[in-house]
Structure formats: C-alpha cells, structure tokens
Amino acid sequence: MVSHPMEKAANGASALETQTGELDQPERLRKIISVSSIAAGVQFGWALQLSLLTPYVQLLGIPHKWASLIWLCGPISGMLVQPIVGYHSDRCTSRFGRRRPFIVAGAGLVTVAVFLIGYAADIGHSMGDQLDKPPKTRAIAIFALGFWILDVANNTLQGPCRAFLADLSAGNAKKTRTANAFFSFFMAVGNVLGYAAGSYRNLYKVVPFTMTESCDLYCANLKTCFFLSITLLLIVTFVSLCYVKEKPWTPEPTADGKASNVPFFGEIFGAFKELKRPMWMLLIVTALNWIAWFPFLLFDTDWMGREVYGGNSDATATAASKKLYNDGVRAGALGLMLNAIVLGFMSLGVEWIGRKLGGAKRLWGIVNFILAICLAMTVVVTKQAENHRRDHGGAKTGPPGNVTAGALTLFAILGIPQAITFSIPFALASIFSTNSGAGQGLSLGVLNLAIVVPQMVISVGGGPFDELFGGGNIPAFVLGAIAAAVSGVLALTVLPSPPPDAPAFKATMGFH
C-alpha cells in the first residue's frame, strides 16, 4: 500500500498540497484484479444509464427537446462531488483506509438510486399519476431524484477506485500499467453486460414481478436491468473490499506540530492558478473532446429509435410508433454492446499502438478525426433511413438491413476513439500531477471539470439547439463532429508529449 504524507509545496504559499514519502512495495496482482473488478459493477449501471434512461424519461412525458435537461444533474454532481471526494479521500484517516469508506458509501447510494429509478412509475401512480394522461409528473420527479443520486453515487465510487489502484501500484510503472489494463478490461465487461441486458426484449421474465399496472414492458425490462446491475455491483464490491485491506493513513505534522490542512475550495482554486501550460492544453483538448462525445452519448439510442427506425417516443404517440422506437432503442443497445467489445480490445492495445504511432498525443489526435468522421456519417445513415421510409410509404417495419448494419458499424468503430478518451487524458493528468507532486484525487478532480462543464453546456443547450435546426439529433451530432476535428488538430499541434517512460501511460479510466 502507499502511504502519502501531506506536505506544503516548496514555496510555502502554494494552495496545492503534495503527497510524498516512502512508498511500500506494490500489492500482489490478484488484489489489483479484485479492486479493478468493481469497474464492472459501476459500468454495468452506467451502460444502462446511457442506453435506456433518455428514452425512458421521454416515455414518461418529457418532450425530446427538454430530455437532455435530466442529464444536467450528472455534470453538476460531477463538478462538485468528484473533486470533493477526491480531496477528502486523499486525506481520510479512517481505520478502514482512505478509499474503502468512499467506495462503500457510493455502492450504498447506487442501491437507493436504482430503486427510485426502477419504481418511479409505480410510486408516481400510487401518488396520483394517471396512466393515460401524460406527463406523469410525480414519476418524473421520483425518476429525477433517483437519477441525481445515481450520478452522485457514481462519482463517489469512480474517483476512490482509481486512486485505490494507484495506491496498490505504489508508483511501480509495470504495476500501474497492469492495474489500469485490468480496470479497462472490467469496464468493458460491465459495458457489454449492461448493453446486452438493455437489448434483450424479454429480460423482465427473469423477475416477473417487475411488470405492474403502471410499469409496462419497457419499464419492467429497465427495472430488471437495474436489479441485475446492483446485484453485480454489491457482490464485486463486497468481495473486493473484504479481500483487499488498506492501511490507515496519518498526515505528517507541519513545523508547528499540526497537520497541514488547506480548505478544499482554496486548494481547488489554487490548483487552477498554478496550472502549467501542459495541463491547460490538456484541459482545453479534453473539453472539446467531450463537446464532441456528449451529444452522441446522450442520444445514441434515441437516434436509432427516432431517426433510423422512424419511431416516436412522445407519450401521445401511437402504439405502432412507440414499438418502432423501442425496437430502435434495443438495436442501439446492441450497437453499444459492439462498441464496448471494440473498446475493450482497443484498451488493451493502447500502449502498444501509442508507441507505434509516435506517442500519446499523436494517437489521441488521430482517433479524434475518426470520431469526427463517424459523427458526420450519422447524417448519411439518417438520410438513407428517411429515403427508405419515403419510398416505402412510411416503412412501419423499420429500416432495411443495410441501413441498420451501417448504423451498428458506426457504433462499433466509435469504440476505438472512446477507448482513447477513457485513457489518455487521465494518464496525462496523472503524469502531470506526479511531476508537480499534487495529490492524485485532486488532480483527477480538476480534469473532471474539463469533462463536466461541456456536459453541462450540452445538457442545457443540446435540445434547444437541435430544435433551432429543425429538431431531431443530427444538429448536435454535426456540432460534435466539428468539435472532434478541432480537438484532433489541437492534440497534434499544441498538446505536449509526455515523457516516454511515464509510469501511468496506460491509465485507462471511466468518466461520470
């Protein structure tokens, strides 16, 4: 285990605190694998969030142009929760360790959130929602509360899990790469399981009581998926934390005999004031990258149901239109499963491919252009689907096979740049924080702001922006393609290259 005493930076006036001291030997590989497995449980639930919850909230009665607002809670909680959790997990003096208490708290919050989301329709109906009169305002309120708690829980889990792996690796380059390779692998496992569950039409039969008067087929499947998700998360978390112990951490006293203690917000703002040019460039490229990614991550399955399959998710839509939409959403979940498989294999090859292409920044720049091309190709797939419906009188059976295959191919190819997005920015942040002596938790929290601020912008403006250009999802996808291209140019031209022997080059991490 790593024991990091906290010391003031050398100039004495710094708002950043550094973590220094003797490093213990890295832990055994089986313990690293055990902690990495928590990523499968977290990512199972995150996959369900991405694939099923945007369509579901529209079925409850929120119009498409406002559906993205439900995601606003995610960036806000990420902006506040992850840096705060990172800060306090770096300093936690619990007898159970620095990271484990936060992981347990996060798993408990996920459990609460899952029940609120899964039973939102049932609770709303019991409180007075009419089954045939949308919008179901009470169900929407319960759903939004659960959604908010779920995002807080995910952010409470993710940061300490990442930091725990760094602690277990004890600064050893080989163990760091190995630990994060396994973290990446289990992320892919969770994604595949989550998207596979979301694509299966009759999953509710595994838990038949999930279908009720107020919870239809789609709702029952979603409820069952989340039950499976929380079961997996609780099992892997319990096993990992019982097996892998942490040493309690004690802060090193300062010259006056007291432990150093800088107020959190003073430290976080101080971190921004002291950022060097490499970190600023990383934040800019990361922000543009997420402006490109987030519209697609929010609306990929909605795009399949609405533009590709020609369905309608509005609460007042016909049963036939809703069926087409649900078929498209399930096809989108299948596409996301293919995406997760490609992401998993690509993650294992990031380090090797990066070396062959001449470094991390060149690899990131190249895959950002792949992202831009794929987002632009959604326009082509959409036009082909629209032409088919026009030529076949509305095509109530969905798109032809070649259109569906084209859409699924885009999902799969996008796994390549997504693997890089989940790895290189976090690896570079770890490298820069190591060079400056800043705590891993705080540094990853600062990088997280470059992810959540674009998410907030898209959550607030995505729906109205689409509506301004005629509705649907394509306008935001085109904007994303432009942002991806700009991000690629900046990654190749202004982003500094990390040292070739950087220990955390392959630090693959998730996001929330």
UniProtKB/Swiss-Prot annotation:
Topological domains annotated Cytoplasmic: 1-31, 87-100, 160-177, 245-278, 354-362, 429-440, 495-512
Biological pathway: Glycan biosynthesis; sucrose metabolism
Record-level GO BP terms: sucrose metabolic process
pH dependence: Optimum pH is 5.
Keywords: Cell membrane, Glycoprotein, Membrane, Sugar transport, Symport, Transmembrane, Transmembrane helix, Transport
Transmembrane segments: 32-52, 66-86, 101-121, 139-159, 178-198, 224-244, 279-299, 333-353, 363-383, 408-428, 441-461, 474-494
Glycan attachment points: 402
Pfam families named in the record: MFS_1 (PF07690)
Molecular function terms, GO-annotated: sucrose:proton symporter activity
Reaction(s) catalysed (UniProt annotation): sucrose(out) + H(+)(out) = sucrose(in) + H(+)(in)
Membrane topology: Multi-pass membrane protein
Domain of life: Eukaryota
Family annotation (InterPro entries): MFS, MFS_trans_sf, Suc_symporter_pln
Induction note: Induced by sucrose depletion. Specifically induced by H.schachtii (cyst nematodes) in nematode-induced syncytia.
Regulation of activity: Inhibited by protonophores (e.g. dinitrophenol and carbonyl cyanide m-chlorophenyl-hydrazone (CCCP)) and SH group inhibitors (e.g. N-ethylmaleimide (NEM) and p-chloromercuriphenyl sulphonic acid (PCMPS)).
Subunit field text: Homodimer. Interacts with SUC3 and SUC4.
Official protein name in the record: Sucrose transport protein SUC2
Organism listed in the record: Arabidopsis thaliana
